[in-house]
Amino acid sequence: MKTLLYKQLRLVCQPMTLVFCLFGVMLLIPAYPYTVMWFYVMLGLFFSFLNGREQKNVYYSALLPIRKRDTVKANCLFVGLIELLALVIAVPFALLRAKLGIGDNPVGLNANVTLFACGLMLFAVFNAVFLLSFYRTAYKVGVSFVKACIVMAVAAFIMEAVVHFPALSRFNGYDLACQLPLLAAGLVIWCGSWPLIFRGAAARYEKVDL
């Protein structure tokens, strides 16, 4: 599996995917819907999957002495690694924003723990829709991405909006007692979704006639 993941990183990973992981710097923008930062990470993943298709990675992998589900597992590990990398890189920028004394974000979520919890949840939503759709054919990258983006955009809009309701405004502050349980929930959702996504995607890919 390590070899397959290495193949994904060396042959499939599009350079812009790694560039978009650096977009945590957007947290230094004073007024901006910060969930867009997570969208760029997903866009980077789309570019890598598109690159894999154009490089005939699916057919190359099919020629290797491995099971189809191993290919799916390697892709899932690749996606998870990129998402974790983006989250980790964004943390120093959130801390720097606080150090610089930049005020609250008037257009949505602040650069706080809740934002990272929402990022994990959005990634889980994107992964479920995108990967399950993609592995129906292992070819239609664009259609799968559009489907995932529509669902993700609705979820992101709700997340950006609900914190403006007085009853939920505490989640948009900086009270860790309120936000750490939300982060834990996001982590559980993200981690817990992977076995389901993998099994579903692998089952669909097994039925694809290459």
Which role does the model predict for each range below?
Residues 63-68:
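Short helix-to-coil transition segments within interhelical loops
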Residues 70-72:
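Alpha-helix N-cap/helix-start motif at helix boundaries, enriched for small hydrophobics
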